[in-house]
Design a protein with these regions (language model features):
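Loop/turn elements at helix/coil->beta-strand transitions in domains of secreted/extracellular proteins
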Residues: 74-76, 99, 127-131, 249-254
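Substrate-gating cap/lid alpha-helix
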Residues: 265-280
Length: 280
């Protein structure tokens, strides 16, 4: 009898342990499902839908948020380039050019970055894209044609929803891009000024710039770079990363321009005897 009672107690304990484990797993899986559902609903990286009208989105991660913006925002044109373009207000393009323009800047962007985002744009919008405003940075167009400035988050750049788990179950996405904006709405991004640099006219003025400016060391004439120093690398980038989109989309106007670098930048370029190479 005692032996049977002991067996029954052990079986009860096993059953209780199984129930507890099943309950824990159920709660755990329900929590994961809830987190995934919340991320899909708010979608702070815009992978599945347009922004919710009421949500105070924080848009400050170019590599991870630009792909969704390219896929799901409404626009006639795009603005691409480095951090120089991040200072632009896209309302200007609508006022002056009549184009609803989406900013898709990448700080320090290489031509491959521009190619990646243009591929997404044209795949998503096709001939709806009326204009591409592309800033050409002299210092980056000689980069390796297959290199991006920062590592690309592949699962955000493709259309495979089955590899999105790192996005859907991401602590930083949940805390920094959903809960924090809800708790403090003052950090919500202005859609016309996405990725706007932190400096303002109050701090970014002639006196402050000159206070911290240190001129580059001046080189001798014999150290000057040849005018065609960057030519081959730039041509390779144009052939691989830029011209294919221009040729494939005759319905789209491409406005290619040099962004307005500071005169101090050009002073450094001149002192380093690189002016002919940079503008060549």
């Amino acid at each position: 009898m005692e032996e049977n009672e002991g067996k029954e107690k052990k079986q009860k304990k096993k059953m209780q342990a199984k129930r507890w484990l099943a309950g824990f797993l159920g709660i755990f899986l329900a929590g994961l499902a809830g987190c995934m559902a919340l991320v899909i609903w708010v979608d702070p990286f815009f992978q599945y839908h347009k922004p919710l009208a009421w949500f105070p989105y924080l848009v400050d991660n170019q590599v991870n948020q630009n792909p969704g913006l390219a896929k799901h925002m409404d626009y006639d044109g795009i603005l691409i380039g480095s951090s120089m373009t991040a200072s632009f207000n896209t309302d200007w393009f609508e006022e002056l050019m009549g184009m609803k323009t989406q900013k898709l800047s990448y700080n320090g962007s290489y031509p491959k970055d521009l190619s990646n985002i243009m591929q997404l744009v044209f795949d998503a919008k096709g001939d709806q894209v009326k204009a591409v405003y592309m800033a050409v940075d002299q210092s980056t167009f000689s980069a390796d044609p297959e290199e991006t400035k920062f590592p690309v988050t592949d699962y955000l750049y493709d259309d495979n929803v089955f590899n999105d788990v790192p996005y859907l179950l991401n602590k930083d996405v949940l805390l920094d891009y959903i809960l924090r904006p809800l708790a403090d709405r003052k950090d919500a991004s202005d859609w016309a000024e996405l990725y706007k640099p932190w400096w303002t006219d109050e701090y970014y003025n002639k006196a402050n710039v000159l206070m911290y400016y240190e001129a580059a060391e001046e080189k001798q004439e014999e150290e000057a770079l040849a005018a065609d120093y960057f030519k081959d690398a730039v041509e390779e980038n144009l052939q691989k990363n830029i011209l294919p989109y221009i040729e494939a989309h005759p319905e789209t106007e491409f406005y290619i321009f040099y962004p307005p670098y500071s005169i101090l930048f050009w002073n450094d370029v001149t002192r380093e005897k690189e002016l002919e190479a940079v503008i060549g």
